[in-house]
Curated annotation (Swiss-Prot):
Keywords: Amino-acid biosynthesis, Arginine biosynthesis, Cytoplasm, Lyase. One of its GO terms (biological process) is arginine biosynthetic process via ornithine. It catalyses: 2-(N(omega)-L-arginino)succinate = fumarate + L-arginine. Pfam families: ASL_C2, Lyase_1. This is Argininosuccinate lyase. InterPro entries: Arg_succ_lyase_C, Argininosuccinate_lyase, Fumarase/histidase_N, Fumarate_lyase_CS, Fumarate_lyase_fam, Fumarate_lyase_N, L-Aspartase-like. GO terms for cellular component: cytosol. Its EC number is 4.3.2.1. GO terms for molecular function: argininosuccinate lyase activity. It is found in: Cytoplasm. It comes from Dehalococcoides mccartyi (strain ATCC BAA-2100 / JCM 16839 / KCTC 5957 / BAV1). Pathway: Amino-acid biosynthesis; L-arginine biosynthesis; L-arginine from L-ornithine and carbamoyl phosphate: step 3/3. The keyword Kinase does not apply.
Length: 461
């Protein structure tokens, strides 16, 4: 029977053991746990709390356990309820009674919290790197299609012409904000709880700053009650992940639509599509669809953690064991989504000719014709009404703007002159030459800005 049940006269019910164990999932914290324990043992020796010999024996044993886990020879025993007890149990087997000194001036409460802080810090770094990779692929495609125009949409209706790089860089901007959020979230994870004990601190002369420095933390926690029971840093990661996955879901939706036969704006590479079990002609955008579907999974992780935390009194409660599965699943899901999306976008083949054909539909120059009338002295509101009636007429006549005669134009306003035919896709794009606009000059600047952002982040493009 585990030493933590010394208070009890009989072992836990077998069902209770299965119900309460976290070892099947929190084993993933083994590196963080061994790293924290190593730093703690070293500090205990420096402070004269345990002997140098015991400290070194503990550290040697922990290194041996790390090797066992990473080579697959470590035996995860079901009776050890979590990774922390599994490692400690094995440490006793390797070095004997000296292992019992490791937990001096430490509780599993501050131990677990510190492990998870380290995990989330690392997760933030990895997530940011994966976002940067996806940004790089978007930028590559933007640079490869500097003059490709397509319809911009509102309400899924053709609205105004934009350049493809402008569209792709919109997602670059979303992902840039995601990077900012994860960078900021990392600051809250970069605080070390170790030394807080179970809830009230510890009665030993610890050097918390020494441990924080060895573990790479920028600060130590300032309130032991808060330190062992707060999971804000997890919630912040999950919140940021939900927003990031939502951005990927939006891009997924467009890849699904754009790759359809009705649009055919893009052809997804065979490596990122699947077939049908019955329809031989199918090339399904399953990767994009799954990314869209997995967004609910990431949202679920956030909702799980918010629900776990909503009614917890200070300080530690066993409910907090439920923080790890949603965290791990979210980190994995978002990470996989970012990686697979980078590959899918990198290998996608955009179809400029199909985009150009779509621009010929939907009277995409209507706003520009209204602006033309404004330039002739008409108010915009009157111009809007004139062009709305002009569109209705063109639809009824089954004509494009370019097919209307000047006489037909002048049925709606005498301000129309021959130069109305100079209003075309190229002029519409060039006219939007303000920062943030879709004009070619602005796109060139936007690409240069994106390249600078990635270069400063250490990403080669």
């Amino acid at each position: 029977m585990s030493h933590i049940r010394s208070r009890f006269s009989k072992p836990a019910d077998e069902l209770v053991v299965r119900y309460t164990t976290s070892l099947p999932f929190d084993w993933r914290l083994y590196k963080e746990d061994i790293k924290c324990s190593t730093a703690h043992a070293r500090m205990l020796s420096k402070q004269g709390i345990i002997s140098t010999e015991d400290s070194q024996s503990i550290i040697n044993g922990l290194n041996a356990i790390l090797t066992e886990i990473e080579t697959g020879s470590f035996v995860f025993k079901p009776e050890m309820e979590d990774i922390h007890m599994a490692i400690e149990g094995r440490l006793f087997e390797l070095i004997g009674e000296a292992a019992g000194r490791l937990h001096t001036a430490r509780s599993r409460n501050d131990q677990v919290a510190t492990d998870v802080h380290l995990f989330v810090k690392n997760a933030c770094d990895k997530t940011i790197n994966k976002i940067r990779t996806l940004q790089g692929t978007l930028l590559e495609q933007a640079e490869a299609h500097p003059q490709t125009a397509l319809p911009g949409y509102t309400h899924m209706q053709i609205a105004q012409p934009v350049l493809l790089p402008h569209h792709l860089l919109a997602y670059f901007e979303m992902l840039e904000r995601d990077c900012g959020r994860f960078t900021d979230a990392r600051k809250r994870a970069d605080v070390m709880p170790l030394g807080s004990g179970a809830l009230a601190g510890v009665p030993y002369p610890l050097d918390r700053e020494m441990v924080a420095k060895e573990l790479g933390f920028s600060a130590i926690s300032q309130n032991s009650l808060d330190a062992v029971s707060e999971r804000d840093f997890i919630l912040e990661y999950l919140s940021d992940a939900a927003i990031c996955q939502m951005h990927l879901s939006r891009l997924s939706e467009e890849m699904v639509i754009w790759s359809s036969a009705e649009y055919a704006f893009v052809e997804l590479d065979d490596a990122y599509t699947t077939g049908s079990s019955i329809m031989p002609q199918k090339k399904n955008p399953d990767v994009a669809e799954l990314c869209r579907g997995k967004t609910g999974r990431v949202y679920g992780s956030l909702n799980t953690m918010l629900t776990v935390m909503k009614g917890l009194p200070l300080s530690y409660n066993r409910d907090l064991q439920e923080d790890k599965e949603p965290l791990f699943d979210c980190v994995d899901t978002l990470g996989d989504s970012l990686e697979v999306f980078a590959g899918m976008i990198k290998t996608a083949k955009f179809k400029p000719e199909r985009m150009l054909r779509a621009l010929e539909k939907g009277y995409v120059l209507a706003t520009d014709i209204a602006d033309y009338l404004v330039g002739k002295g008409e108010s915009f509101r009157n111009s809007h009404g004139i062009v709305a009636r002009l569109v209705s007429y063109a639809v009824a006549q089954n004509k494009t703007f370019g097919e209307l005669s000047l006489a037909e134009y002048r049925q709606f306003s005498n301000l129309f002159e021959k130069d109305i035919y100079a209003v075309d896709i190229k002029s519409a794009l060039n006219a939007r030459n303000l920062p943030g606009g879709t004009a070619p000059k602005q796109i060139a600047q936007a690409i240069a800005r994106a390249k600078k952002i990635l270069a400063e982040a250490g990403v080669k493009n």
